Every structure is written in structure tokens, then in C-alpha cells.
Amino acid sequence: MSSDLYANAVLYSEISQRNPELVSKMFNEATRKKLDAFLKDNEAPKLKDIVTDNVFKKRKRIASSSGNEPPVKKMAAKDSSDSDSSDDGAVKKNGVQKPVNVAAKKSATPVQKKAESSSSSDSDAPAKKLTPVKKPAQTPAQKKAASSSDSDSDDEPPKKAPAVTTKVAPKPMAKKQDTSDSDSDSEDSDDGKSKKANPVKVTPVANVLQKVVAKKAASSSSDSSDDEKKPAAKPTPAKPTPKPVVKKAESSSDSSDDEKKPVAKPAPAKATPKPAAKKADSSSDSSDDEAPAKKTPAKAAPKPVAKKAESSSDSSDDEKKPAAKPTPAKATPKPVAKKAESSSDSSDDEKKPVAKPAPAKATPKPVAKKAESSSDSSDDEKKPAAKPTPAKATPKPVAKKAESSSDSSDDEKKPVAKPTSAKATPKPAAKKADSSSDSSDDEAPAKKTPAKAAPKPASKKAESSSDSSDDEKPAAKSTPAKITPKPTAKKVASSSSDSSDDEKKPAAKPTPANATPKPVAKKAESSSDSSDDEKKPVAKPTSAKATPKPAAKKADLSSDFSDDEAPAKKTPAKAAPKPASKKAESSSDSSDDEKPAAKSTPAKTTPKPTAKKAASSSSDSSDDEKKPVAKPTSAKATPKPAAKKADSSSDSSDDEAPAKKTPVKPTPVKIVAKKVDSSSDSSDDEKKPTKATPVKVTPKSVTKKAAASSSDSSDDEKKPVVKQTPNVVPKKEKAASSSDDSSDDEKKPTAKPTPKATPKQSAKKADSSDDSSDDEAPAKKTPAKSTPAKTAVKKEASSSSDDSSDDEKTKKKSATTPAKSTPKTALKKAESSDSSDDDEDLPKPSKAVTPRPQRADSEESAETEESSSRTPALKAKPLATSTEKAVYENRKRKSSPFRRVQMTKDSVSEKFRNNQHDSHFDQWGQRANESLGKVVGKAFRHEKTKKKKGSYGGGPINQSINSIKFSDSDD
């Protein structure tokens, strides 16, 4: 009899006894028949015979000791075991694999048991007892898992029982895989072997199957990367008892990862050795990688840092599996180093589990890897190599922070992922690809990361902010620092990604302070991450690199928008380190909490904080809702406004929120570029790049403006208050801060880009339709950033679109500044029309209308139409009414009583002219008709009543339907 059959028979009999319901799910009919027949002829040993009670007890003891946090570990283990089961399933060659898949699905039940067994490698045996449930889920997986995972070293000793033969066959295969995997983790695996061998020995066949699976899960969870590399790593988990944290992190990461893609793991495990390859894989295997990433994390297990990274990488996995939450607890223990790496590895792990181990061993490499990884996420597709260079050791922590910020929104989504997220974030690039899955993950990590990130405030924070987006594009961050030119390119890409990134990783903003170019790129990445995380769109990473992907981003953004809101909140926690910035953020946090990430970034840009704060303050009132803090970054991001703008449009919803902020922030006009940016950043936070772009490209700014105006429409709607403030503040600063961009923009941009505005307005308008909300926000940003001239245009766009209400308020100011206003007004008004929402929102359109005369363009016409639609329309109606009234009254005002319409037979169609009763089929009707036909008026009613009340004296009543079908032509 084949070892597989024997093992299956043991499992089958055990499961049928303990949890019969699972049998049908784990074994198909053919298999069941086969096993039944086999069991008739041969009596399969029982688990009790294979595994002694005393081993179970031992294991149990170990289990409890192995993790003081059994629940967490168990959960993680559960997930990991689950994934293991699936993994094993993948390894399995037999048809059992199918059952495995089922088992994986069912892992919930098995998982519990498995959780126990997996919770501690040692506890696996006892878990086995419980395993019955577990067994079903893992049976195939277990067997094969056992063989595959046990094959490492577990199986051989455990197999001593009948299992030896049983599992031996599978072992080779599993072992092979494991071997490749275990090669990297040979040490761990060896240790695990020794450890495993002892407990496992007793666990033969059936037990081993489950145990192995459980163990595998445990090891996978504990040695997520080890596991991946070597299920044998299980022992390591046992060993790692001291490393419970690591284990847990891994476990959690494994849990979700395993759950997600246990199958993918094996391949990733192999891939691990080749980070580059893995990276490639990682992009393609973003989801797969997640599962593999888990394994890789396991590898990292020996190396706390790596492990944590794994944990973080698992974070995204965790995202999928709340089990990851427990991991956070453990993950916390190995804070900085681990976290940094973990963060960098987090996304990397997801994408390149292999990379993770490397990072663990060599932080420098991890950074590079991270860079790659992050670059992988957005750049991976584009230029992972470039990013590695930027990757710095510090970046990791920063990455973490970035993760944290990026995670902030993610955190909201998946608090569980938090621990892992923190780590996962670091490898945003990879993560980015995985980002969608990581998005929630990041959220969780964000929380943790902030705490840790705090330690490395200056570099980390700066980097962190940069990392925020950098996390996704660490390379971008580093590279920008190293290579400004690249930053630009990157920035553009990042810019587009920034829009959402900003929301997600305002931290990037602070970095901008450090490196204006970088921030943008980072931000782009960050934003890319935010939405990427949520959506996992590969396009996003690309978009980070290539503005062209804004569309994709936009889609992402929409998802990001909600995501970002969550992250923003978390990010603020991070931001805490920088009081000033934070304060601004704080105010902005009130409503900005939704987008604290942006704030965090501002926090980082402490230098700008004061100005920002002021802007933040005024803008915060209403902008708080949106993220005034982000503005600082905007200033930096300025360079990549164009790209950002695209992103901005992408960030329609995001921008809306930011847009509001933007007006607020521009308090100081002098900082105008920056502050405007800052104000614009508020929305720019979400769309920092937008502003930046305006500075660089006035034309773009105009375009942006239009877009912004349209997007602002929502923003304006959202935050008319802020705009009102602008009204009050005619001064540039005040205008900037209060009007935000409204008066500021008007004043500044007024003279500036009328020409540009007009042409771009068209484009913008188009954009605005697309990015109605988004563009508005970006527009605001853009204006802020635009060079004075550009700023004028931008601001105008910003003020006009951003502050549609502002615009109108501003327009008053605009009117005040006729010279400037005229060009601006045109643009603005055009934008105003673009931000029809804004105009609609605010009765200011009339104001807008006032400047309108100055705008002589389609813009004016459009705006006029809009305001007209509001005010003019109303006015028009009155006029029409007055004229019509006279005529109407003349006709109507004859004091004549209401009279019935006189119908002449000529006006009735032939079909209906004869209204006579057709009595040839209805005697009763005929009789009634005779009496009723002669009567008209009140008498008819009387006659009819008599007929109704009288006794029926006719024949059968005809119940056929004699109605007439009217056709349209028969009117």
C-alpha cells in the first residue's frame, strides 16, 4: 500500500470519528470509496497508537510555555497552519490536494485545532488530538504537509511510526521543495529538526500529518520565512520560543499569508534565494508573494529584524487575517531594528519573501532590497534597480514610519494587520503591488510604526515622511536625495501616485521639506500606496513612476479615499513626534484625522510648521477636515505638480477633502509657494504633487486649476466655511490662509496665467469633469505651488476651483483686483464653471458673475451658465414670468367661473365617436342601457343608483372585457 494511501486512511478514519462533517469536504467520493475499501482490508492505526498521550501532554506544556500569548499565537498559527495546509496542498501531488483546498477553505475549523498545534510547534502533537477538526482541513494538506513540511526533518523522525513509509514518499518531494527553501533556512531547519524530531517522532502518520501540518503552521507562523524555506523550521519556532515575538509576527503574517496563498508559498520559498527573481515574482505574485512573503518572514524568524519584517510583510497578509493582530503584540517586542527591516521587508516580504531574509542578514541590503521592493511596488514594474540605490539604512525605519502613515489608512481597514503592517509598509514597493492587500495591513502597521518611527525622528521622520510615499518607493526617496533628476522623474510618477499617496503617506510631505524633489516622488509613491494598498493596482506603482497612470490611480484613489481617511488618523499618531507640525496637523486632524497621514507629513516639515500652522489653523477650521498639514509637503512637492495633478484628478475624493484644506493653508502668501502649497497641501497632502507641478509647469498648473476647480467644486461644497474666511481676508496671507487660495490665488494668479489658464482650462475642464473633486483639491494645491506667476495661475485655478466658494468670495476680491482678476477671473470663472458644484454650493456665483464680464471666454460663458443657472436662471424666469403674466392675466383674468372643456365630435377620433352600449351580447347591460341611455346629468346618477340597488333581473352577466386600446396616434 502506498504511504499516501496509508496516511490518508489514518486521517480518514480519524476524521470520520472526530468530525464526520469534514470527511466529505476533505475527501472526494472516489477517494472515500478507496479508503473505505482499504480500511476494510487493512486496519489503519489510530492516532492514539501512533502518538502517545504523554507526547501530547508534553506538547501541550510546551505549547503553553512556547507562547504566553497563546490566543495570538494560536490565531496566527491557525492562519499559518491554514496556509500551511494549503501550502502542503500545493506540495501534495495526490488528489488529496483538492481536499486540501477544501480544507484550506474549511481551515476555519481545522484552523482552530491547528491554531493550537500551530500556535506552538510543540503544541502541535496535542493539537493533533484536537486536530480531528484540524485534520479534516489539513488532512490532505497535513499528510502532504506532513510529508512536505515534515519532509524537512520533521517527517522523518515523526514518520517512524507507520507514517515513516507513508510520508516518506511525499517527503522527497516536500523535502525537495523544502530543501530549496530550507537551503536558505538550513540552519533554522536543522535546529528545528533537532527540536522537531523529538516531539514529532512520536507523531507518526496521522498525527504527523496533522502535527506536521500544525507544526508546519506553527513553524510557518513562527518561521514564516523559515517555514517557507523549511517547514523544518517548525522546530525553530519551538526554539524561537524565546523568539515568540518573531514567531508570532511570523505566525500572524503566516496566518493571513498562509490563508491567502499557502500554495504560492512554496514557490516563493524557492524564489526567496533570488531576491531579484522574487521581485519580479513579487510583482506578478503580489498576492502570491504575500503568501510566500510569509514564508520568507519565517526565514527571517531567526533574525528578529527580518522576522519582524516578515511579520510586517505578513501584515498585509494579516490584513486578510485578523490573526495578524496578535502578531503585532509580538512584533512590537522587536521594535526598531526589526521594525525597520520588518517595515522595509513588510512589503518586500509580501513581494519578495526572499528579500526579507536578506534584509534580516544585511540591513544595507535590506534597504537596497527595500528600495527595490518599494521600487518594486511602484517601480518594481518600472525600475526596481534605481530605487535600491536610494534605499538607505535609515530608510527602513522611515519606511516603517511611512508604512505607518500609509498604514494609517490601512490600519483603519485592518487593525489586525497593524503589527505586520508596520513592517509591511517598509516594503511598500513590493507592498504596493501587494499594497491592495497591504492597504489594510499598512493601516495596522502604521500605528505601530509611528511609535517606533518616533525614535528616529529627524532622519527617520524626514525619511519617514519621504518614506511614507517612499515606503512604497524607498528608492524614490533615497534616489531623490542622491539624484535630484531622478526625483523629478520619480516625482512625476510619484506625483501621480502622490495624489493618493499623499493622503496615505503625508509623512512624505515632511520629507519634501528635506528634499523637495524626493517628497514628491515619495508622496506619489505614498499616495500610490494608499490607493494601491487598497486596490493593489500594479498600475499604481507604474503611475507612481508614470503620471499617465493617474487614471488607474484615480480608481485606486476612490478606494484610497476611504482608506486614506483611516490612515490619516493613524498617521497623526505618528506625527506626534513633531509638535509644531503636529499641532497644525492636530487642528487639521480634527477632521483631518481622516487624513492624518498628510498631517504627519506636515509634522515632519517642522520648519514649515509655523507658517503651515497658521495656514493650518485657518484652513484647519474647515480644512481640518481635510488635512491642512499636507500643505507643507505640497510646497516641496511643488516640483511635480503636473504629475500630481493627474494624481490629483485621481484623488478626486481625496482631493476634495484636501482641496478644502488647501484654501485654508495658504495663509501666508509669501510662503505662497510653500504655504499655498501648504494650504494646497492640505488638499495637496493628498495631492501634494499637484501643487508642485504648478510651480514647475505653469501650463500644467492651469490645467490643474481647471481640474482643481472642478474637483474643488466638491471641496468648496464641503468646506464653504473655509472659503468664507478667505472672503474676510483680503490680504495675501490672510487670503491665502483664510481664502486659502481664494483671495490669495486670485491676487497672486490674477495677473499671471490668464492665457495659460484659458487653454489649459479647456483641458482642465475636461479634467475637472473627470477629477471634479480631485482636481479641485489639486488645483488648490497647484495654485499654491505655482511660481508667483505660476502661483497666480495656479492659485487662481486653485482659488477659482478650490475656492469655488472662495472663488466667489475671492472673486469679489478678484473684482477688487480687476487687472489681475480679469485674467484670473476668466480662468477662475471658467474653473468656477468647472466647479459648478462649488458655485452651486455658494451663492457667490453672483460674485463670480460680477467678475465674469472680465472673463470673456467659453469659461465665462460656462461660468455664466452656471451662475446663470443659479441666479440668472432665477432672474430669467422672473422676467419671462412678468411678460407672460401680462398676457396670461389678460386671458385668464376674466372673472368667469371655471367651465368644462367643450368637446366637439369633430375633435374626437372616429373610433370613439360612437359611445353607444353594444348590447348584442349582454341582456342585462342592454336593459340598463335602455333606461340609462335616455338620462343625462343628475338624473343619470339617480338612475344608475336605482339599478345598483334594485334586484338583478337579467340573464347571465357578461364579464368579458370590452375596453378600448388607445394608441399614441389616437390622441
From Swiss-Prot:
Main subcellular location: nucleus
Basic and acidic residues bias: start-end ranges: 907-921
GO MF terms held by the record: rDNA binding; RNA polymerase I core binding
InterPro entries in the cross-refs: Nopp140-like, Srp40_C
Residue ranges, compositional bias (Acidic residues): 180-190
Region (Disordered): 61-926, 938-971
Tissue-specific expression: Expressed in the nerve ring and hypodermal tissues. Expressed in the intestine. Expressed in the germline.
Localization in the cell: Nucleus, Nucleolus; Nucleus, Nucleoplasm
One GO BP annotation of this record: determination of adult lifespan
Keywords: Nucleus
Biased composition (Basic residues): 939-950
GO CC, any one term: nucleoplasm
Keyword Nucleus: yes
Superkingdom assignment: Eukaryota
Biased composition regions of type Polar residues, renumbered to the chain: 957-971
Residue spans of biased composition, Low complexity class: 134-150, 264-275, 294-304, 324-335, 355-366, 386-397, 417-428, 447-457, 476-498, 508-519, 539-550, 569-579, 598-620, 630-641, 691-712, 751-761, 780-791, 815-825
Pfam families the record matches: SRP40_C (PF05022)
Family stated for the protein in its record: Belongs to the NOLC1 family.
Job description of the protein: Nucleolar protein which binds to RNA polymerase I and rDNA and is required for efficient RNA polymerase I-mediated rDNA transcription. Maintains the epigenetically active status of rDNA chromatin which facilitates rDNA transcription and sustains germline development, ensuring fertility. Plays a role in the modulation of nucleolus size. May play a role in the regulation of lifespan.
Quaternary structure and interacting proteins, as annotated: May form dimers. Interacts with RNA polymerase I.
Full protein name: Nucleolar protein dao-5
Organism: Caenorhabditis elegans
